[in-house]
Structure formats: structure tokens, C-alpha cells
């Protein structure tokens, strides 16, 4: 009988560590709700003790996610576990994930400890976590380089202490698939109480083997796989969840396991993560790359036309990719736009129909026909800009030629006041940015700029993603328009609003901290 493999998503914890700019609470929640819709069993959404912002993110997600178990990370440190529990207590169901290094190298050079001390600490911390929840996961950091006898001792002790999931990470992506399968098999042979816990794996892609190692572990008996959408993560990334999920589905004949994932949501979730995290998906990326279902060879094209199964082991539709693109025009009504969004799988709660329709009409007037990819881009940008705005682009104009310095004039609404400035720059985009900096006095430093076409042809929407540095912190901004300079200006204004909102959040956190301190003094 087929057994279920639990899908543990760590996009918002381990995956976020790869980003050049931290995600806002709203952006994290948007991804969390998409993961819930996709059907992940567990989502690890942060490391609450690391910062007040991470604590708030975990708490916000724990309060709103209902159908997936929410998890937070904690070192084998009392404060970590207590803070994780505090952030999660609003959830309907939650898990605490605690970890400690077990390899000789890490124990000697990082922890400056002994294996016996590590085991003692693991036991104590697992028991502490069990005081808050009956769902405790324990990870043996750098398990891939831990001798199997040592690893078995730690695992047995953690299970006896109350751990219900034991995670075996290949922390540095060093292990080969046959080795990793041997580790899992070895634990089943050596740990007498292993049937009392679920064995999980967490692999990294330093040698390009993360997915292979995870599947080898599943074949050897692991029943939870940890990873991130699109494989994002530190260094070369995490195990790519969509690849593992589809491999399990396509090769159920040999693996004899299944997941509870809604496969129809894979493509949309992948695209959302890519857009919010500002990490483009390579065209040749398995499952979700733009070329994953493309056939250019004449022989292949002929074979696909005769029978798709000749060269396709899965269909685009199986991951929710609808290849039929319908177009709307400025004569299409609000109901037609809503109907198309419904057909693409969007719920009304995921976008504001009034705002989307207004943006649709403006775009339709410019380019005539609006396609599915245009609607999705407009819905995404609309969601990103739903929060209160302190800054708003009122007007801009640019003068530029091949031989002269570009000049830009910009009007920016700053709260209730409209300010205007002009500036020169090395090209039209730089001139606009110089003018905006003069208006705000923020002195924002551009770190990364990227442009992506949303659609095809000369009238395609251009999405500009930027990362900017301000006071030692990095902020992400995104803008969308058929004009590249306008997209660029909107992206910078988005950055300014994110800076302003971050400052407002910091003020609110300080106010709450002061309020709590005053209450303590009163008591």
C-alpha cells in the first residue's frame, strides 16, 4: 500500500536566507497562503528569536494559516524554544523544530563540546519543546558527515526524549545519493525506537544532488522531505520541492509513495515565489522553467503531435500551467475580467477587482489586447501595492539623446504634500532616480536592477525589480508598465514606501515594548 510522504516547506525560513532583501510580513504571508493552497503539510516560516520582525512574521502567519501546520526554528537553546512557542501559540496546530550539530567537525570546532554533551543538550531541549506541543522535530545538523554509530545514538536519545520527527540534513550538500540512502537504511537498522518517529531529510544542492538525495532517502524509508519552492536557499540552494513532488507523482511505480499536494497549484506558487523573492526561474529549470514543456527539435515536435507521451512524461496541465492564452480588450467588462481570473484559479480574496479592472482598462487602451500573463502581472503588482502608501509617483518626464546627459523632472506625492525636482543622470533611469533622491533626502543606493518582459512583442509589460540599500538594510521594489522608465520609477517609489513602512513598524514595536515595560513596572 502506498504511504504518504510529508512535504515540509522551508521557503520562508531557509529559502529566504538567499535573498538580497528581506521579505516584508505581507510578502511572507502572501507566500504562506499560496503554500497552504498548494497543500504543503508543514511550513517552516521563520526563526523567531532572531529579530522582532521575524517573530511578528511567524505570529502573523500562525494566526492566518489554517490547513497547514506552521513551524518555527529554534536552536537547542532555552530562549530560542520559549520564543518560538510564544510566536506559534496563536496557531491551530504548530511544530517546534530544534537542532544541534552532530558531526565531529562541528562538535569540535563550532560547539567546542563532546558528543555526550550534545546528546544531553538535545534530550533537555526536546523535552522543553514538548512542554509546549506534542509535535517536535529534532535535526542533527551536518548529519551527512556524522558517523552512523554517533548519529544513531543521537537519534535514539531524541526519540526517547519525545521528538516525533527526526530530520537528517545533508547540510553542506556533500553526500552522494547512494551514501544518503545508506544513512537512512543504517538508522532503520541501528535505532530500536525508530518506529516512534517520522524520518525526515533536508538536502542542499552544492553538488547538484539535493533532489536525487531526497528521492534516494524516500526510497530507503524517509517519509518527510524538506525543501523550498524553486530550490531557493543558501549557497546553491535547497532541495527543489516541485521537482521532488512531481518525481514522486510520475515515478509512483518505483517509489510506491504519494503526497497530499494539489499539483494544479505548483506552477502558480512557483511563479509567485519567483516574483516576490526577485529570483527569476531559469528557462531550463525542471518542472517550472519556461522551456520545461517546449519542443524545438523537428523529430520531437512530430512525435509530440502524434502522441504527447512520446516526449512528455507529464503535461503542463498537471502542474496548473494552462497553455491556452485568451485575450481581452478595452471593450471587455468587469465580469469578463473576473471570469478569466476565476478560470485561471484566482480567488476574489487574492486581488482587488476594482483596482485590477482599472489597471486592465489603462493597459488595454495602450496595447489593445490584454492576455492572461498581463492579468497575472497586474494582479501581482496590485497585491504588492495594497498597503498604505506615503509616496506616490504623480508625474515624470525625461529628455535624453545618444550624445547628451539625460534630464528628468519628477513630481512625487509625499503624504499630503506634492514635491517636484529635476536632475541629470547617466541615462533616463538614473536621472529619474537622482530626482527622486533629491525629493526624499533618503539617499538610497541602488544595489541591483533587473528587467523582465511579461508577455511577448514590443508592447509587452516590463517588470522592473530593484534592490536598494538604505541605512545598512536592503529593500526590494517592483514596478510594472509598458514604458521601462515608468516601471523603473514605480519600482523606486515602491522601495521608498517599503522603507517608510519598515520605519513605522519599528516605531510600533518600540511602542509595544515600552508599553510592556511600563506594565511590568506597574505590577
Swiss-Prot record:
Q: Which cofactor does it need?
A: Mn(2+)
| Name of the gene | leuA
Q: How does it assemble?
A: Homodimer.
Q: What class of enzyme is it?
A: transferase
Sites binding Mn(2+) sit at 14, 202, 204, 238
In which compartments does the protein localize?
A: Cytoplasm
Q: Which reaction does it catalyse?
A: 3-methyl-2-oxobutanoate + acetyl-CoA + H2O = (2S)-2-isopropylmalate + CoA + H(+)
Region spans: Regulatory domain = 392-523
The protein's matches in NCBIfam families, at most eight in alphabetical order, are given as: leuA_bact, PRK00915.1-1, PRK00915.1-3
Q: What does this protein do?
A: Catalyzes the condensation of the acetyl group of acetyl-CoA with 3-methyl-2-oxobutanoate (2-ketoisovalerate) to form 3-carboxy-3-hydroxy-4-methylpentanoate (2-isopropylmalate).
**Which residue numbers delimit the Pyruvate carboxyltransferase domain?**
5-267
Q: GO annotations under biological process?
A: L-leucine biosynthetic process
Name the coiled-coil region(s).
none
- What name does UniProt use for this protein? 2-isopropylmalate synthase
Q: EC number(s) in its UniProt entry?
A: 2.3.3.13
- Identify its protein family: Belongs to the alpha-IPM synthase/homocitrate synthase family. LeuA type 1 subfamily.
One Gene Ontology term, aspect cellular component: cytosol
Amino acid at each position: 500500500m502506498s504511504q504518504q510522504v510529508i512535504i515540509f516547506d522551508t521557503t520562508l525560513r531557509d529559502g529566504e536566507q538567499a535573498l538580497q532583501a528581506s521579505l516584508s510580513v505581507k510578502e511572507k504571508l502572501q507566500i504562506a497562503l499560496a503554500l497552504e493552497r498548494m497543500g504543503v503539510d508543514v511550513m517552516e516560516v521563520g526563526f523567531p528569536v532572531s529579530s522582532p520582525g521575524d517573530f511578528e512574521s511567524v505570529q502573523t502567519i500562525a494566526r492566518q494559516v489554517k490547513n497547514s501546520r506552521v513551524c518555527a526554528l529554534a536552536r537547542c537553546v532555552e530562549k530560542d524554544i520559549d520564543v518560538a512557542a510564544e510566536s506559534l501559540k496563536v496557531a491551530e496546530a504548530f511544530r517546534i523544530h530544534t537542532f544541534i550539530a552532530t558531526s565531529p567537525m562541528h562538535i569540535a570546532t563550532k560547539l567546542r563540546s563532546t558528543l555526550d554533551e550534545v546528546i544531553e543538550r538535545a534530550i533537555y531541549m526536546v523535552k522543553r519543546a514538548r512542554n509546549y506541543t506534542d509535535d517536535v522535530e529534532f535535526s542533527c545538523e551536518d548529519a551527512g558527515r556524522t558517523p552512523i554509530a554517533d548519529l544513531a545514538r543521537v537519534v535514539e536519545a531524541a526519540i526517547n526524549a519525545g521528538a516525533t520527527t527526526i530530520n537528517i540534513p545533508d547540510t553542506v550538500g556533500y553526500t552522494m545519493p547512494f551514501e544518503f540512502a545508506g544513512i537512512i537504511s543504517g538508522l532503520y537498522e541501528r535505532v530500536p525506537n525508530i518506529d516512534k518517529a517520522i524520518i525526515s531529510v533536508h538536502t542542499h544542492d552544492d553538488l547538484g544532488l539535493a533532489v536525487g538525495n531526497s528521492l534516494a532517502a524516500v526510497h530507503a524509508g524517509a517519509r518527510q522531505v524538506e525543501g523550498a519552492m524553486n530550490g531557493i536557499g543558501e549557497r546553491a540552494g535547497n532541495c527543489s520541492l516541485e521537482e521532488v513532488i512531481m518525481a514522486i507523482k510520475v515515478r509512483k511505480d518505483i517509489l510506491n509513495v504519494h503526497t497530499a499536494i494539489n499539483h494544479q497549484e505548483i506552477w502558480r506558487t512557483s511563479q509567485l515565489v519567483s516574483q516576490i523573492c526577485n529570483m527569476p526561474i531559469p528557462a531550463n529549470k525542471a518542472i517550472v522553467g519556461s522551456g520545461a514543456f517546449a519542443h524545438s527539435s523537428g523529430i520531437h515536435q512530430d512525435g509530440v503531435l502524434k502522441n504527447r507521451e512520446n516526449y512528455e512524461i507529464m503535461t503542463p496541465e498537471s502542474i496548473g500551467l494552462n497553455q491556452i492564452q485568451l485575450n481581452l480588450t478595452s471593450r471587455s467588462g468587469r465580469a469578463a475580467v473576473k471570469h478569466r481570473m476565476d478560470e485561471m484559479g484566482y480567488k476574489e480574496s487574492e486581488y482587488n477587482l476594482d483596482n485590477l479592472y482599472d489597471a486592465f482598462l489603462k493597459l488595454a487602451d495602450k496595447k489593445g489586447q490584454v492576455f492572461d500573463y498581463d492579468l497575472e502581472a497586474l494582479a501581482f503588482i496590485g497585491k504588492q501595492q495594497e498597503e498604505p502608501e506615503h509616496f506616490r509617483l504623480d508625474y515624470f518626464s525625461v529628455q535624453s539623446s545618444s550624445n547628451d546627459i539625460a534630464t528628468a523632472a519628477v513630481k512625487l506625492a509625499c503624504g499630503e504634500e506634492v514635491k517636484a525636482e529635476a536632475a541629470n543622470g547617466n541615462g533616463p533611469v538614473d536621472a529619474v532616480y537622482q530626482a527622486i533622491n533629491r525629493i526624499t533626502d533618503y539617499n538610497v543606493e541602488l544595489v541591483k536592477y533587473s528587467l523582465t518582459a511579461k508577455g511577448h512583442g514590443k508592447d509587452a509589460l516590463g517588470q522592473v525589480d530593484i534592490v536598494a540599500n538604505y541605512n545598512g538594510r536592503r529593500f526590494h521594489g517592483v514596478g510594472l508598465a509598458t514604458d521601462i522608465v515608468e516601471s523603473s520609477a514605480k519600482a523606486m517609489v515602491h522601495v521608498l514606501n517599503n522603507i517608510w513602512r519598515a520605519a513605522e513598524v519599528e516605531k510600533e514595536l518600540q511602542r509595544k515594548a515600552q508599553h510592556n515595560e511600563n506594565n511590568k513596572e506597574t505590577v
